[in-house]
Structure formats: structure tokens, C-alpha cells
Amino acid sequence: MTAKFTDYIVKDIGLAEFGRKEISLAETEMPGLMATREEYGPKQPLKGARIAGSLHMTIQTAVLIETLVALGADVRWVSCNIYSTQDHAAAAIAAAGIPVFAIKGESLEDYWDYTARMFDWHGGGTPNMILDDGGDATMYVHLGLRAENGDTAFLDKPGSDEEVIFFALLKKQLKEKPKGYFAEIAKNIRGVSEETTTGVHRLYDMQKAGTLLWPAINVNDSVTKSKFDNLYGCRESLVDGIRRGTDVMLSGKVAMVAGFGDVGKGSAASLRQAGCRVMVSEVDPICALQAAMEGYQVVTMEDAAPLADIFVTATGNKDIITIEHMRAMKDRAIVCNIGHFDNEIQIAHLKNLKWDNIKPQVDEITFPDGKRMILLSEGRLVNLGNAMGHPSFVMSASFTNQTLAQIELFANNKDGKYKKEVYVLPKSLDEKVARLHLAKIGVKLTELRKDQADYIGVKVEGPFKADHYRY
């Protein structure tokens, strides 16, 4: 008799059937991942890979997880955000016998406990690959090893409420785990593929400091990720989150978007298409000029605070909306964030004010003067906290890149071509990912003749652009 599988923590395993139905629907909308299974499945390039995955536990991620398993990998999974888990997706993955530790609305204590549990491989041993979104799994090992090697002073100097919890976990691990626990993990990891801008910044910082422990592939800066997921994904999912959270009429409202990178561009377009009059703030003169040329009013947050009805942060930086900005806002202004972390808005400065929870991930905060503010997802990702995240089709492109990156680092690095540095996938794979998604939406490519290809100095089959080309 087979032992019952219990290596998971989900809200309700009874949601598995619902999750499986939605996974089936998503597979139809994720041609890149399904083609990857068909092409690479027989070769099993990830056989022997033990992947620790920290990425939003959604229906789309379930398709990614099952693709990795179909290619031979052994996987353990957590969500990279306390509000982004879709409980029926987590249940379906658990019911399939894949370890997953994720509950929508989990506490920060649970979040970090689940991250630690992800690294404790069932049957002994450690993971040998990381698939990360935001860099928390990567930081867990790097900072754990740093403390294990005797540099523990930083553990007594947390810079945020979350670091208080994270550093307490590291102290606990140092006491309870055998000596050399983090060193063993670090030694076994062959590489990490990183999904998002914030995590990529962390990787480049470590590379610059000479502390990066293993090769890393920056999936975020693949064109078929950043110019699609970040832009077109946000264009669809931002307004979905605001509407589900507030039920307000967006048409005619004044909206303020902080940041005009790819996420900001998609966010501004999302609000404009909903009928909002959109303002943008930027520190980069190039992005500011782009916003102005697109017809957006480019202002500062100080200018916008008393004018806008809706505020969205999309910068990847900290303290973008300060307590002073919030005090200057209209009564019941809506404030949310679509960057990876919750520090774009000074949430900590609001903790001593009156909070009224209206419904999950929607809070009304009252200031001493009686003015109120509507805060979505406590300043965390609004499109995943208040809605269902990006559509399956655009996530197929991102996750196909993730799968190819895992194959590169695990199966195609036997000659040691990947050092302890940050890389991007080659242009040929970027174009391959795009090509896999064309038929689904009825795109017919024009083909170059040989003489035309020679004329512009490319191969008939591509790549068609130089690495420095900006799409």
C-alpha cells in the first residue's frame, strides 16, 4: 500500500479538482510551455535536477511546475508573496504529489518558514537549482551562509518588519541545523534563474560585490519576458485588481503612476484604456520624455498627491509614496503597488492609524483629521493580491524562458561556460520563445530570402537583431 502523500501545506486540498480544471484551461493558453514539454520531454534534460522554486503559486505557475516535472525535475515550491497564492492551484499541485507550501494570506512568519521548508529536501539532500522571483530564496542561502561563517552582526540590525522575521528565522536555523547546513546547500546549487526586476537587481549587486555563489540567468531581461509580461501583462491585470478590490468607476478618474519602465508603461496604458486621465512621475529623463510623448502629464508625486483619485507605484524603489504624500491625498483615494516589494509605499508609517478591513486585501485607513485612504493588498502586488495576476498567454512566454534557463544552467553547463556571474539567454532562444506563441494568435511570419538576409547581415532563420537592439 502506497503511503499517503503529506509533504505539503495548502489551505484546502479539497480545492484540487477546481484547480485541475483551471490548469487544463491554462494549458490551452500556454503554447510555449506545452511545446517545450513536447520537444524536451523525451530527452529529460532536467533528470536529476532538484529545483527549489519560489514564485507566485498561481494556475499559470502550476503549468510551469508540471512542465519542469515533465522534463525530469524533482520540485519543491513556495509562493514569493504572501497574497499571491491561488489556493486551488496550490491544492492541485499538492494533489499531484508535488511538495508545495503556500496559502493566500499567509503570515510573514509562515512565508519564511515555508521558504526554509522548501530547502529541506524530502529523503535527505538539498536542492541543486533555484528558480526565483524577487530573490528571497537566493538571499536565504547567501545570508544564511554569511551568518554560518561567523558574520552575524547584521542579524541584529534588521531594516524592516520583514527582516525582523527573516533574521529571526536565520538565527533559529543556525541553532537547529547541523553545522555546515548552508554551506552544503550553497555547494550543491548549480545556478538560479530569476524572474523579476527586483531580484535581478539583487543578483547584479552580489556580482558587483563578488559575493554571488553560483551562476545566474536573468530571465527578466529576455525580451519575451520584460516587453511582454511586464508591459502587456500589467496592461491587463492592473485594472482587474483595482476593479475587483474597489468596484469603482475608473472612467473619468485621475490616476497617478509612479515609474515609467515596462511595468509603468503597461500600468499607465491599463488605466488610460479604462478611461482614466493619467499622470506619471519619473526620475529618468528618457522615460519621462517617453511618457510625455505618449501624451501623459509628467509631474512629481507632490504635484499629484492632492489631485489624483488612484495611485499606483511601479518603480522597484522604496518610499515612493510617503506618509506626507498620503496625508495630502483626497478622501478615500485608492493607493496600490504593482512592484515586487511592499516598501514602495510607507506602510510602516500607517500602522498606528485606524485600520478597517473592508474585505480580503482591501483596507480603509483613517488619518487623525478624519481623512480616509483605501489601501489594496497592504502595498503588495495588487494584480495578484486583489485579482488573478497576468493572463496565461503572456505568462507562457515568461515561463518558457524560465524553463529554458533551468535547462541551460543544469544540463548545458558541463563545460563550465557559466561562471559565478549574471547572464541573459541568447537572442536565438528569445526569438524561439516568441515563435512558439505566434500560431496561437494567428500570426504569419514573412520569411527572408537569402539575398535579403545577406543584405542586412543576418541568417535567414535569425537571430534578426543585434544584442544591443532595443525593442
Curated annotation (Swiss-Prot):
Its EC number is 3.13.2.1. Pathway: Amino-acid biosynthesis; L-homocysteine biosynthesis; L-homocysteine from S-adenosyl-L-homocysteine: step 1/1. One of its GO terms (cellular component) is cytosol. Its cofactor is NAD(+). Substrate binds at residues 58, 133, 195, 225, 229. NAD(+) binds at residues 196-198, 230, 259-264, 282, 317, 338-340, 383. Keywords: Cytoplasm, Hydrolase, NAD, One-carbon metabolism. It is found in: Cytoplasm. InterPro entries: Adenosylhomocyst_ase-like_sf, Adenosylhomocysteinase-like, Ado_hCys_hydrolase_NAD-bd, NAD(P)-bd_dom_sf, S-Ado-L-homoCys_hydrolase_CS. GO terms for molecular function: adenosylhomocysteinase activity. Binds 1 NAD(+) per subunit. It catalyses: S-adenosyl-L-homocysteine + H2O = L-homocysteine + adenosine. GO terms for biological process: L-homocysteine biosynthetic process; one-carbon metabolic process; S-adenosylmethionine cycle. Pfam families: AdoHcyase, AdoHcyase_NAD. May play a key role in the regulation of the intracellular concentration of adenosylhomocysteine. Belongs to the adenosylhomocysteinase family. This is Adenosylhomocysteinase. It comes from Rhodopseudomonas palustris (strain HaA2).
